[in-house]
Protein backbone atom coordinates (compact mmCIF):
# COMPACT_ATOMS: atom_id res chain seq x y z
CA UNK A 1 0.00 0.00 0.00
CA UNK A 2 1.35 3.42 -0.96
CA UNK A 3 0.12 6.71 0.43
CA UNK A 4 0.61 10.44 -0.04
CA UNK A 5 -0.77 13.10 2.29
CA UNK A 6 -1.39 16.70 1.24
CA UNK A 7 -2.20 19.74 3.36
CA UNK A 8 -5.02 21.76 1.87
CA UNK A 9 -6.57 24.98 3.15
CA UNK A 10 -6.74 25.37 6.93
CA UNK A 11 -7.34 22.04 8.66
CA UNK A 12 -8.27 20.14 5.51
CA UNK A 13 -6.13 17.24 4.38
CA UNK A 14 -6.15 14.92 1.39
CA UNK A 15 -4.67 11.45 1.30
CA UNK A 16 -4.19 9.34 -1.82
CA UNK A 17 -3.95 5.62 -1.15
CA UNK A 18 -3.08 2.80 -3.53
CA UNK A 19 -4.02 -0.77 -2.59
CA UNK A 20 -2.22 -3.65 -4.29
CA UNK A 21 -4.16 -5.65 -6.88
CA UNK A 22 -3.54 -8.99 -5.15
CA UNK A 23 -5.18 -7.70 -1.96
CA UNK A 24 -8.26 -6.60 -3.90
CA UNK A 25 -8.44 -9.94 -5.70
CA UNK A 26 -8.12 -11.88 -2.43
CA UNK A 27 -10.94 -9.85 -0.93
CA UNK A 28 -13.01 -10.34 -4.08
CA UNK A 29 -12.69 -14.11 -3.85
CA UNK A 30 -13.73 -14.06 -0.20
CA UNK A 31 -16.79 -11.97 -1.07
CA UNK A 32 -17.79 -14.45 -3.79
CA UNK A 33 -17.48 -17.32 -1.30
CA UNK A 34 -19.90 -15.50 0.95
CA UNK A 35 -22.37 -15.04 -1.87
CA UNK A 36 -21.96 -18.69 -2.90
CA UNK A 37 -22.90 -19.99 0.56
CA UNK A 38 -26.27 -18.25 0.54
CA UNK A 39 -27.14 -18.00 -3.17
CA UNK A 40 -30.41 -19.58 -4.32
CA UNK A 41 -30.47 -20.47 -8.01
CA UNK A 42 -33.11 -22.67 -9.60
CA UNK A 43 -31.74 -26.11 -10.45
CA UNK A 44 -28.98 -26.02 -7.83
CA UNK A 45 -28.86 -26.84 -4.15
CA UNK A 46 -27.96 -24.06 -1.71
CA UNK A 47 -24.17 -23.72 -1.59
CA UNK A 48 -23.65 -25.84 -4.73
CA UNK A 49 -24.06 -23.16 -7.40
CA UNK A 50 -21.12 -23.19 -9.90
CA UNK A 51 -18.51 -20.48 -9.45
CA UNK A 52 -19.05 -19.14 -12.98
CA UNK A 53 -22.74 -18.50 -12.28
CA UNK A 54 -21.98 -16.87 -8.91
CA UNK A 55 -19.44 -14.57 -10.56
CA UNK A 56 -21.83 -13.73 -13.38
CA UNK A 57 -24.64 -12.84 -10.99
CA UNK A 58 -22.79 -11.33 -8.06
CA UNK A 59 -19.37 -10.35 -9.39
CA UNK A 60 -20.11 -6.64 -9.78
CA UNK A 61 -21.67 -6.34 -6.30
CA UNK A 62 -18.80 -8.32 -4.78
CA UNK A 63 -16.21 -5.98 -6.32
CA UNK A 64 -18.09 -2.91 -5.09
CA UNK A 65 -18.24 -4.39 -1.58
CA UNK A 66 -14.51 -5.12 -1.61
CA UNK A 67 -13.56 -1.68 -2.89
CA UNK A 68 -15.78 0.02 -0.30
CA UNK A 69 -14.38 -2.08 2.54
CA UNK A 70 -10.80 -1.56 1.39
CA UNK A 71 -11.25 2.22 1.25
CA UNK A 72 -12.47 2.22 4.85
CA UNK A 73 -9.85 -0.22 6.09
CA UNK A 74 -6.92 1.33 4.23
CA UNK A 75 -7.87 4.87 5.26
CA UNK A 76 -8.07 4.05 8.96
CA UNK A 77 -4.80 2.11 8.71
CA UNK A 78 -3.27 5.37 7.45
CA UNK A 79 -4.91 7.34 10.28
CA UNK A 80 -3.39 4.99 12.85
CA UNK A 81 0.02 4.70 11.20
CA UNK A 82 0.41 8.44 10.64
CA UNK A 83 -1.19 9.35 14.00
CA UNK A 84 -3.71 11.62 12.31
CA UNK A 85 -6.03 13.44 14.74
CA UNK A 86 -9.12 12.95 12.59
CA UNK A 87 -12.08 15.34 12.90
CA UNK A 88 -15.41 14.24 11.46
CA UNK A 89 -16.01 11.80 8.64
CA UNK A 90 -13.84 11.55 5.53
CA UNK A 91 -15.15 11.92 1.97
CA UNK A 92 -14.01 9.08 -0.30
CA UNK A 93 -13.47 9.41 -4.06
CA UNK A 94 -12.48 6.11 -5.76
CA UNK A 95 -10.47 6.25 -8.98
CA UNK A 96 -11.47 4.11 -11.97
CA UNK A 97 -10.70 0.49 -11.24
CA UNK A 98 -9.95 -2.33 -13.63
CA UNK A 99 -9.89 -5.94 -12.37
CA UNK A 100 -6.37 -7.19 -11.90
CA UNK A 101 -4.93 -3.72 -11.37
CA UNK A 102 -4.00 -1.74 -8.25
CA UNK A 103 -6.86 0.23 -6.71
CA UNK A 104 -6.39 3.86 -5.70
CA UNK A 105 -8.69 6.33 -3.99
CA UNK A 106 -8.63 9.82 -2.49
CA UNK A 107 -9.95 10.67 0.99
CA UNK A 108 -10.55 14.29 1.99
CA UNK A 109 -10.95 15.09 5.67
CA UNK A 110 -10.31 17.57 8.47
CA UNK A 111 -7.96 17.26 11.41
CA UNK A 112 -8.01 18.80 14.85
CA UNK A 113 -5.39 21.53 15.30
CA UNK A 114 -2.23 21.03 17.31
CA UNK A 115 -2.79 23.35 20.25
CA UNK A 116 0.18 25.01 21.91
CA UNK A 117 -1.12 26.89 24.92
CA UNK A 118 0.00 30.49 25.23
CA UNK A 119 -0.41 33.32 27.68
CA UNK A 120 -1.45 31.35 30.77
CA UNK A 121 0.54 33.78 32.91
CA UNK A 122 -1.49 36.66 31.43
CA UNK A 123 -4.85 35.28 32.52
CA UNK A 124 -6.35 37.38 35.33
CA UNK A 125 -8.80 35.75 37.72
CA UNK A 126 -10.67 37.44 40.55
CA UNK A 127 -11.56 34.90 43.21
CA UNK A 128 -14.32 35.97 45.63
CA UNK A 129 -13.78 35.11 49.29
CA UNK A 130 -17.10 34.72 51.09
CA UNK A 131 -18.15 33.99 54.64
CA UNK A 132 -21.80 33.13 55.23
CA UNK A 133 -22.97 35.41 58.06
CA UNK A 134 -25.85 35.22 60.52
CA UNK A 135 -27.48 38.03 58.53
CA UNK A 136 -27.31 35.84 55.40
CA UNK A 137 -29.02 33.05 57.33
CA UNK A 138 -31.68 35.47 58.58
CA UNK A 139 -32.45 36.47 54.98
CA UNK A 140 -32.76 32.85 53.90
CA UNK A 141 -35.09 32.07 56.81
CA UNK A 142 -37.20 35.06 55.75
CA UNK A 143 -37.35 33.63 52.22
CA UNK A 144 -38.80 30.41 53.68
CA UNK A 145 -41.26 32.40 55.76
CA UNK A 146 -42.38 34.34 52.70
CA UNK A 147 -42.97 31.07 50.87
CA UNK A 148 -45.45 30.15 53.60
CA UNK A 149 -46.87 33.65 54.00
CA UNK A 150 -50.55 34.57 54.04
CA UNK A 151 -52.13 37.92 53.20
CA UNK A 152 -54.54 40.11 55.16
CA UNK A 153 -56.62 42.82 53.51
CA UNK A 154 -55.98 46.36 54.75
CA UNK A 155 -57.32 49.87 54.28
CA UNK A 156 -53.82 51.31 54.65
CA UNK A 157 -51.76 52.63 51.75
CA UNK A 158 -49.89 50.03 49.68
CA UNK A 159 -46.29 49.28 50.63
CA UNK A 160 -43.48 47.87 48.50
CA UNK A 161 -43.97 44.27 49.70
CA UNK A 162 -47.79 44.18 49.72
CA UNK A 163 -50.06 42.27 47.37
CA UNK A 164 -52.52 44.33 45.36
CA UNK A 165 -55.45 43.63 43.06
CA UNK A 166 -55.78 46.14 40.22
CA UNK A 167 -57.42 46.95 36.92
CA UNK A 168 -55.16 48.72 34.46
CA UNK A 169 -55.21 50.10 30.95
CA UNK A 170 -51.96 51.06 29.24
CA UNK A 171 -51.57 53.54 26.40
CA UNK A 172 -48.80 55.05 24.27
CA UNK A 173 -49.44 58.48 22.76
CA UNK A 174 -53.05 58.16 23.87
CA UNK A 175 -53.59 54.84 22.05
CA UNK A 176 -54.14 51.56 23.91
CA UNK A 177 -51.70 48.79 22.96
CA UNK A 178 -52.08 45.03 22.78
CA UNK A 179 -51.45 43.26 26.08
CA UNK A 180 -51.65 46.48 28.06
CA UNK A 181 -55.01 45.87 29.71
CA UNK A 182 -56.16 43.62 32.58
CA UNK A 183 -58.91 43.29 35.18
CA UNK A 184 -58.61 41.89 38.72
CA UNK A 185 -54.88 41.48 38.20
CA UNK A 186 -53.20 40.17 41.37
CA UNK A 187 -49.69 41.56 41.79
CA UNK A 188 -47.25 40.48 44.51
CA UNK A 189 -45.09 43.57 44.76
CA UNK A 190 -41.34 43.60 45.21
CA UNK A 191 -40.60 40.70 42.87
CA UNK A 192 -39.68 42.73 39.80
CA UNK A 193 -42.43 41.26 37.62
CA UNK A 194 -43.45 44.59 36.11
CA UNK A 195 -41.51 47.21 34.16
CA UNK A 196 -39.55 49.80 36.20
CA UNK A 197 -41.74 52.47 37.77
CA UNK A 198 -44.98 50.48 37.66
CA UNK A 199 -44.94 49.08 41.20
CA UNK A 200 -43.38 52.25 42.58
CA UNK A 201 -46.37 54.16 41.19
CA UNK A 202 -48.78 52.01 43.22
CA UNK A 203 -46.97 52.45 46.54
CA UNK A 204 -48.70 55.03 48.74
CA UNK A 205 -52.18 54.57 47.23
CA UNK A 206 -55.17 53.01 48.99
CA UNK A 207 -57.86 50.60 47.84
CA UNK A 208 -60.61 52.40 45.90
CA UNK A 209 -58.30 55.02 44.40
CA UNK A 210 -57.92 55.64 40.67
CA UNK A 211 -54.70 57.17 39.36
CA UNK A 212 -52.25 57.23 36.46
CA UNK A 213 -48.68 55.94 36.33
CA UNK A 214 -46.14 57.25 33.82
CA UNK A 215 -43.42 54.78 32.83
CA UNK A 216 -40.88 54.16 30.07
CA UNK A 217 -40.54 50.70 28.56
CA UNK A 218 -36.96 49.35 28.72
CA UNK A 219 -34.93 49.50 25.51
CA UNK A 220 -34.56 45.70 25.64
CA UNK A 221 -38.33 45.07 26.11
CA UNK A 222 -39.54 42.00 24.18
CA UNK A 223 -42.27 43.82 22.21
CA UNK A 224 -40.58 45.71 19.38
CA UNK A 225 -43.30 48.38 19.16
CA UNK A 226 -42.90 49.30 22.84
CA UNK A 227 -39.10 49.40 23.25
CA UNK A 228 -38.05 52.69 24.85
CA UNK A 229 -41.57 54.15 24.55
CA UNK A 230 -43.18 56.40 27.20
CA UNK A 231 -46.48 54.94 28.39
CA UNK A 232 -49.30 55.82 30.73
CA UNK A 233 -51.22 53.28 32.81
CA UNK A 234 -54.65 54.14 34.21
CA UNK A 235 -54.90 52.21 37.49
CA UNK A 236 -57.88 51.24 39.63
CA UNK A 237 -56.59 49.90 42.96
CA UNK A 238 -59.24 47.42 44.14
CA UNK A 239 -57.53 45.70 47.06
CA UNK A 240 -54.41 46.02 49.21
CA UNK A 241 -53.16 43.08 51.28
CA UNK A 242 -50.33 43.04 53.82
CA UNK A 243 -48.00 40.07 53.88
CA UNK A 244 -48.29 38.05 57.11
CA UNK A 245 -45.19 36.00 57.85
CA UNK A 246 -45.58 32.83 59.95
CA UNK A 247 -43.93 32.63 63.36
CA UNK A 248 -40.82 30.49 63.71
CA UNK A 249 -42.52 27.61 65.52
CA UNK A 250 -41.78 23.87 65.57
CA UNK A 251 -44.75 23.36 63.26
CA UNK A 252 -43.21 25.78 60.76
CA UNK A 253 -39.74 24.21 61.03
CA UNK A 254 -41.07 20.68 60.35
CA UNK A 255 -42.21 21.77 56.89
CA UNK A 256 -38.56 21.93 55.79
CA UNK A 257 -36.50 18.76 55.91
CA UNK A 258 -35.73 16.80 59.07
CA UNK A 259 -35.05 19.75 61.38
CA UNK A 260 -37.07 19.93 64.60
CA UNK A 261 -35.87 23.25 66.01
CA UNK A 262 -35.07 26.66 64.55
CA UNK A 263 -31.37 26.14 65.25
CA UNK A 264 -31.39 22.79 63.44
CA UNK A 265 -33.16 24.46 60.53
CA UNK A 266 -30.49 27.16 60.39
CA UNK A 267 -27.78 24.48 60.33
CA UNK A 268 -29.50 22.76 57.37
CA UNK A 269 -29.97 26.07 55.59
CA UNK A 270 -26.29 26.93 56.06
CA UNK A 271 -25.24 23.58 54.58
CA UNK A 272 -27.41 24.22 51.53
CA UNK A 273 -26.05 27.76 51.20
CA UNK A 274 -22.47 26.49 51.43
CA UNK A 275 -23.16 23.94 48.68
CA UNK A 276 -24.75 26.59 46.43
CA UNK A 277 -21.92 29.01 47.17
CA UNK A 278 -19.24 26.45 46.33
CA UNK A 279 -20.91 25.72 42.98
CA UNK A 280 -21.29 29.43 42.20
CA UNK A 281 -17.65 30.18 43.06
CA UNK A 282 -16.42 27.22 41.02
CA UNK A 283 -18.46 28.36 38.03
CA UNK A 284 -17.31 31.98 38.31
CA UNK A 285 -13.63 31.06 38.49
CA UNK A 286 -13.98 28.49 35.70
CA UNK A 287 -15.64 31.04 33.41
CA UNK A 288 -12.80 33.49 33.98
CA UNK A 289 -10.22 30.80 33.22
CA UNK A 290 -12.02 29.76 30.03
CA UNK A 291 -12.40 33.36 28.88
CA UNK A 292 -8.69 33.87 29.54
CA UNK A 293 -7.75 30.77 27.56
CA UNK A 294 -9.87 31.92 24.63
CA UNK A 295 -8.47 35.46 24.74
CA UNK A 296 -4.88 34.23 24.63
CA UNK A 297 -5.35 31.32 22.21
CA UNK A 298 -7.25 32.03 19.00
CA UNK A 299 -7.34 28.53 17.52
CA UNK A 300 -8.85 27.35 14.26
CA UNK A 301 -11.47 24.62 14.63
CA UNK A 302 -12.71 21.94 12.19
CA UNK A 303 -16.00 22.86 10.53
CA UNK A 304 -17.15 19.25 10.98
CA UNK A 305 -16.73 19.50 14.76
CA UNK A 306 -18.64 22.79 14.80
CA UNK A 307 -21.43 21.21 12.73
CA UNK A 308 -21.71 18.34 15.21
CA UNK A 309 -21.92 20.80 18.10
CA UNK A 310 -24.58 22.80 16.24
CA UNK A 311 -26.69 19.63 16.08
CA UNK A 312 -26.26 19.13 19.84
CA UNK A 313 -27.37 22.71 20.52
CA UNK A 314 -30.34 22.29 18.20
CA UNK A 315 -31.49 19.21 20.09
CA UNK A 316 -31.06 20.97 23.42
CA UNK A 317 -33.08 23.95 22.20
CA UNK A 318 -35.93 21.69 21.08
CA UNK A 319 -35.93 19.82 24.40
CA UNK A 320 -35.87 23.10 26.34
CA UNK A 321 -38.97 24.37 24.61
CA UNK A 322 -40.82 21.06 24.57
CA UNK A 323 -40.69 20.50 20.81
CA UNK A 324 -40.48 17.25 18.88
CA UNK A 325 -36.96 15.89 18.10
CA UNK A 326 -37.55 16.08 14.34
CA UNK A 327 -37.99 19.86 14.66
CA UNK A 328 -34.28 20.29 15.45
CA UNK A 329 -33.17 20.08 11.81
CA UNK A 330 -35.51 22.97 10.95
CA UNK A 331 -33.70 25.40 13.25
CA UNK A 332 -31.22 27.58 11.29
CA UNK A 333 -27.62 26.54 11.92
CA UNK A 334 -26.46 30.16 12.10
CA UNK A 335 -28.40 30.60 15.36
CA UNK A 336 -25.96 28.26 17.07
CA UNK A 337 -22.69 28.57 15.15
CA UNK A 338 -21.00 31.14 17.42
CA UNK A 339 -21.71 29.15 20.59
CA UNK A 340 -20.87 25.87 18.85
CA UNK A 341 -17.48 27.19 17.71
CA UNK A 342 -16.78 28.48 21.21
CA UNK A 343 -17.60 25.09 22.74
CA UNK A 344 -15.28 23.28 20.35
CA UNK A 345 -12.48 25.76 21.08
CA UNK A 346 -12.99 25.38 24.84
CA UNK A 347 -12.93 21.59 24.53
CA UNK A 348 -9.67 21.66 22.57
CA UNK A 349 -8.03 24.12 24.96
CA UNK A 350 -8.99 22.17 28.08
CA UNK A 351 -7.86 18.93 26.41
CA UNK A 352 -4.51 20.57 25.75
CA UNK A 353 -4.25 21.63 29.40
CA UNK A 354 -5.01 18.05 30.48
CA UNK A 355 -2.48 16.55 28.05
CA UNK A 356 0.33 19.03 28.68
CA UNK A 357 -0.03 18.61 32.45
CA UNK A 358 -0.47 14.83 32.18
CA UNK A 359 -3.61 15.04 34.32
CA UNK A 360 -5.44 11.90 35.42
CA UNK A 361 -8.87 11.78 37.01
CA UNK A 362 -8.70 11.94 40.81
CA UNK A 363 -10.98 9.02 41.73
CA UNK A 364 -11.20 10.08 45.39
CA UNK A 365 -12.45 13.44 44.22
CA UNK A 366 -15.02 11.70 42.02
CA UNK A 367 -16.38 9.91 45.09
CA UNK A 368 -16.44 13.17 47.07
CA UNK A 369 -18.32 14.93 44.28
CA UNK A 370 -20.94 12.18 44.12
CA UNK A 371 -21.32 12.30 47.91
CA UNK A 372 -21.82 16.08 47.78
CA UNK A 373 -24.47 15.72 45.09
CA UNK A 374 -26.18 12.99 47.09
CA UNK A 375 -26.25 15.09 50.27
CA UNK A 376 -28.86 17.36 48.67
CA UNK A 377 -31.37 14.47 48.64
CA UNK A 378 -33.39 12.91 51.45
CA UNK A 379 -31.78 9.47 50.92
CA UNK A 380 -28.11 10.16 50.08
CA UNK A 381 -27.08 6.49 50.25
CA UNK A 382 -29.60 5.59 47.55
CA UNK A 383 -28.24 8.31 45.27
CA UNK A 384 -24.65 7.10 45.75
CA UNK A 385 -25.78 3.54 44.96
CA UNK A 386 -27.62 4.78 41.87
CA UNK A 387 -24.43 6.34 40.55
CA UNK A 388 -22.50 3.15 41.30
CA UNK A 389 -24.96 1.17 39.17
CA UNK A 390 -24.87 3.66 36.28
CA UNK A 391 -21.35 3.89 34.81
CA UNK A 392 -22.40 6.55 32.30
CA UNK A 393 -23.45 8.91 35.10
CA UNK A 394 -20.22 8.24 36.96
CA UNK A 395 -18.25 8.94 33.78
CA UNK A 396 -20.02 12.30 33.53
CA UNK A 397 -18.79 13.13 37.04
CA UNK A 398 -15.28 12.01 36.06
CA UNK A 399 -15.36 14.45 33.15
CA UNK A 400 -16.49 17.25 35.47
CA UNK A 401 -13.72 16.47 37.96
CA UNK A 402 -11.05 16.28 35.24
CA UNK A 403 -12.23 19.63 33.89
CA UNK A 404 -11.96 21.11 37.40
CA UNK A 405 -8.42 19.74 37.66
CA UNK A 406 -7.59 21.40 34.33
CA UNK A 407 -8.94 24.73 35.58
CA UNK A 408 -6.81 24.41 38.71
CA UNK A 409 -3.73 23.72 36.56
CA UNK A 410 -4.35 27.00 34.71
CA UNK A 411 -4.97 28.85 37.99
CA UNK A 412 -1.55 27.73 39.21
CA UNK A 413 0.02 29.83 36.43
CA UNK A 414 -2.54 32.66 36.19
CA UNK A 415 -2.69 35.96 38.07
CA UNK A 416 -5.19 35.26 40.84
CA UNK A 417 -6.42 37.96 43.21
CA UNK A 418 -8.81 37.43 46.08
CA UNK A 419 -11.69 39.79 46.76
CA UNK A 420 -13.87 39.85 49.87
CA UNK A 421 -17.49 39.48 48.75
CA UNK A 422 -20.88 38.81 50.28
CA UNK A 423 -23.07 35.78 49.69
CA UNK A 424 -25.67 37.91 47.89
CA UNK A 425 -23.07 39.49 45.60
CA UNK A 426 -21.81 36.12 44.41
CA UNK A 427 -25.22 34.49 44.03
CA UNK A 428 -26.73 37.46 42.18
CA UNK A 429 -23.99 37.43 39.53
CA UNK A 430 -24.19 33.80 38.46
CA UNK A 431 -23.87 33.05 34.74
UniProtKB/Swiss-Prot annotation:
Record-annotated PPIase FKBP-type domain positions: 161-246
**Claim: Cytoplasm is one of the keywords in the record:** yes
Set out the biological process GO terms recorded for this chain's protein: 'de novo' cotranslational protein folding; cell division; chaperone-mediated protein folding; protein transport; protein unfolding
Role: Involved in protein export. Acts as a chaperone by maintaining the newly synthesized protein in an open conformation. Functions as a peptidyl-prolyl cis-trans isomerase.
- Mind telling me which GO cellular component terms the entry cites? cytoplasm
Tell me where in or outside the cell this protein is found: Cytoplasm
In its UniProt entry, the species of origin is given as: Glaesserella parasuis serovar 5 (strain SH0165) (Haemophilus parasuis)
Question: Pfam families per the record?
Answer: FKBP_C, Trigger_C, Trigger_N
GO terms, molecular function:
peptidyl-prolyl cis-trans isomerase activity; protein folding chaperone; ribosome binding
Present the record's domain note: Consists of 3 domains; the N-terminus binds the ribosome, the middle domain has PPIase activity, while the C-terminus has intrinsic chaperone activity on its own.
For this chain, the family text in UniProt reads: Belongs to the FKBP-type PPIase family. Tig subfamily.
Q: What EC number(s) does the entry state?
A: 5.2.1.8
Q: Which reaction does it catalyse?
A: [protein]-peptidylproline (omega=180) = [protein]-peptidylproline (omega=0)
What this protein is called in its record is Trigger factor
Keywords recorded for this protein, A-Z:
Cell cycle, Cell division, Chaperone, Cytoplasm, Isomerase, Rotamase
Amino acid sequence: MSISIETLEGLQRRVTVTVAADKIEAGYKEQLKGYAKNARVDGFRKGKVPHSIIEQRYGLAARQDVLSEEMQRAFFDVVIAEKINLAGRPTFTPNNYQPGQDFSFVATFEVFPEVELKGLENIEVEKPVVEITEADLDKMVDVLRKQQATFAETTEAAKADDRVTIDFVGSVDGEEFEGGKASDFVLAMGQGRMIPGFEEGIVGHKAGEQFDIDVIFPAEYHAENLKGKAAKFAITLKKVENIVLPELTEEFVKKFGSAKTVEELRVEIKKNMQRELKNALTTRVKNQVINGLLANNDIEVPSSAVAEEVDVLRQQAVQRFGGKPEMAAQLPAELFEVEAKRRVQVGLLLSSVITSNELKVDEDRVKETISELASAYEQPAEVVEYYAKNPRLTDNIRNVVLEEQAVEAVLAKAKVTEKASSFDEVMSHQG
